């Protein structure tokens, strides 16, 4: 994104401070004013400055609170993708290899880090990649002599049970080393660094453990558990000492030019280090930031310190807002003399404030000006002027559903059992937050109930246990009810309110959002008519739900998706076998082509068979040229179809006149052959003549293709791709991978059946006709153009973004009443039942791994697209929610956060688009 004038001015001011020797600056712009855009501009200007002083390398380190934000924001800092390090490889202890890899490739590098993965060495044993690389360097350096195999066993840990899996990590890291242009020089330097940084005591301890492993080698299991030889804590401590050693080495090599600390108040320990704290994290932070006078440091935070102190904080002797402010300033003003001067000026200002007199303010004003001048040398802040542009009076609050008896029943059920078993009280906040608690919660109170059911506290008779479980009908989901698509019992007012909102329920219901596969575009190119489900749902928005409870996103993701399926299912009169019951579908659906052209490998009947798939994914240039939205903007769809049909008919009549080919009904294969022939004719190429020319009904299909075929629309949207062959191929592959797969999903097929219920003439062989009509009704061209504009991407980048916008239908387990009852018998069920997730998604996995980082990115990309999911429930707050805004103008707080800073915010992009109107004379009004 291009910086606005005030953002450009702020960035210029920051770099000017850097040039003058103020190497630590705080950017404290108000929330929503684009601190990341300012940071991007600072990155660009600092890079230009480094070039001016002939600095050949430019290294930027980006530190934020978690891996999700790192992935979200690194792409916005203006450094090319190939010069950015993946957050999964952003471990401080691995940077020595990354720096060697990029040395020969580029002189610009962006390295993302998080406090948990880079500075808190003691929190775990590191990643497998991290341990594998450390082992290989130690082996190459000969640090542990002949104990190579034993050291490998030690570094593997029991997390990697299979030796083959560990071997893969070793081979991958060795491959990275082998690819270095100066492999020998790198290994030589690392040997020298290890000799300087690895203490003799550590080497001695490692060798001692290796000797033990060698002595008892035959007794050790294959899963790498050391058993009685070494406790896990001892093994972890030893590995972490090695990790710390490599982190120190990387730190010495890193020497970044610019360090950006985003929302640093979430990890203030990095800048507020106690001199008596000798932990590994404190020592690394001190070397990286406190003792580093060369790197420029940019702190980003709208709330760098608390604006006030509460009475409780003062009573308990906790840090006050003044202490927090002074700690931040002590970091920013890092010269001793400068720091003393700032404290003197601020104390004088505070003293004058306390002695304020109405008859003489000149001394106070002079003191205030001096204090402001001192602050201005170390921080920048821009605030939004409230001129009434944002009118919150028009904001509509959700009306909460009335409590039903079932809402209270679930609490009574659980509290009654806990009281009888003497295991305490059930938290009422849980009951308010989620329904079917025994099916979804994973908290200690659930463990208490499970223990009581198992007879761990008191012996329990099986018949009493079965009766107790039976007496909790409001606390469990029943698999049998789910399988029959029964309505969910009204057990939670919050969930019912959410359903009313997102499914537009009520007596005056006009739209059916459960039938949508994408959000209706804000600027539709034509009027599709009242029959269009997209017209009925005009103005529909995605919904972002924040909750402090981990179970809530799982509840919302599963039950909202189930409710969407149920609402669709009840609209289908003639159900196929797979639509009659919920669990008729396999829990894991594979959409790849199998030998049967109508079925995939698991026997699931696909909506689009192979010939239809090829037709839907074919970007016909001939058809693309027949429709241009500007020509028909704002007109009725039926009139546009009439005009386009005549244009196509004229071309077909010309072919008939020249070749004498007769008309007849065409299938998908024949239509595809016709389009290939017509496209070749445009280029003056010779192609085999089609067997027949299209009938009048087929002309209608071609008209819908010209207006809204996904492949044709993509071809038009890729008008910035100059290579015509590449443009066609990008449109074809993108459509095949993304949109054909979308229509082939079970929930999409049910939607097609529901939408076209009662309409005649749609045989299984012509499902492609339904796709084209559905896309025309949904203003597909307008939707895809809006998405491209919102992303700001072009060509291959846009295609990649589309492919990343689709979440595969997944499923999450729940504990059904049947499963729970069976778990206490001698015949427990092998696997808990699962619920499909597609209409809504959850964003709640707090563990950091390559897999969860990828999932976080997938969820974010999908929710920030016009496609499903339409509801996202997340435990993230504050900054993590800021980027979920392109198609969402609704924010729901399931539980209000304690800190106002954590109230969810969204950019008003979608709301603004909805309020833009174009008058008949072309004037744009808001």
Which residues does each predicted region cover?
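Short hydrophobic/aromatic-enriched beta-strand-loop microsegments
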Residues: 891-895
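Helicase motor interdomain insertion/brace
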Residues: 1-887, 897-926
